[in-house]
């Protein structure tokens, strides 16, 4: 399976990079993993609704241009469906079973994701009703993907 994480903005925090690199290395035993960073749109501190929509639209175009047409797209959204680790593992297993070898996870920028990206999404996934920094979500997401593969192979993992 090919797992791609598309995320808005550059990861600057060294400790997050180290954690992500560790899980990416571990995941190589199960899947091909790539991380694509698309540029975030520079935005003023205070914006009108129209300006916010435009920022999301521009970031959305960059996100969409990095997604293969045949990929199964999972967007991370506060209002998405909440799944437990076992349920996410089952979903990834089902995708592999039904021939969906390309799975793309999308993490939007600080304003979220555009409606165009939401329309392209096959599954809107929520990790919590809380808001997290999108850089931190990369680490949380890649750990959960790793955990999913361990679960699907009957290997031990922390509950």
Curated annotation (Swiss-Prot):
Location within or outside the cell: Cytoplasm
Positions contributing to S-adenosyl-L-methionine binding: 76, 108, 127-132
EC category name: transferase
GO MF, any single term: rRNA (pseudouridine-N3-)-methyltransferase activity
This enzyme's EC code(s): 2.1.1.177
Keyword Cytoplasm: yes
GO cellular component: cytoplasm
Database matches in Pfam families: SPOUT_MTase
InterPro entries associated with the record: Alpha/beta_knot_MTases (IPR029028), RlmH-like (IPR003742), tRNA_m1G_MTases_N (IPR029026)
Reactions it catalyzes: pseudouridine(1915) in 23S rRNA + S-adenosyl-L-methionine = N(3)-methylpseudouridine(1915) in 23S rRNA + S-adenosyl-L-homocysteine + H(+)
Entry function: Specifically methylates the pseudouridine at position 1915 (m3Psi1915) in 23S rRNA.
The protein's name in its UniProt record: Ribosomal RNA large subunit methyltransferase H
Taxonomic source organism: Oceanobacillus iheyensis (strain DSM 14371 / CIP 107618 / JCM 11309 / KCTC 3954 / HTE831)
Gene: rlmH
């Amino acid at each position: 399976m090919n797992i791609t994480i598309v995320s808005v903005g550059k990861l600057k925090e060294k400790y997050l990079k180290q954690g992500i690199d560790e899980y990416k290395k571990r995941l190589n035993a199960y899947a091909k993993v790539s991380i694509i960073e698309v540029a975030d749109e520079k935005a003023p501190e205070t914006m009108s609704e129209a300006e916010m929509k435009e920022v999301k639209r521009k970031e959305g175009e960059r996100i969409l241009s990095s997604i293969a047409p045949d990929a199964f797209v999972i967007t991370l959204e506060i209002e998405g469906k909440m799944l437990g680790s076992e349920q996410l593992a089952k979903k990834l297993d089902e995708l592999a079973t039904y021939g969906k070898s390309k799975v793309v996870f999308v993490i939007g920028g600080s304003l979220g994701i555009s409606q165009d990206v939401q329309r392209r999404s096959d599954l809107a996934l929520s990790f919590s009703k809380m808001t997290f920094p999108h850089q931190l979500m990369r680490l949380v997401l890649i750990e959960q993907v790793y955990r999913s593969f361990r679960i699907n192979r009957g290997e031990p993992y922390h509950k």
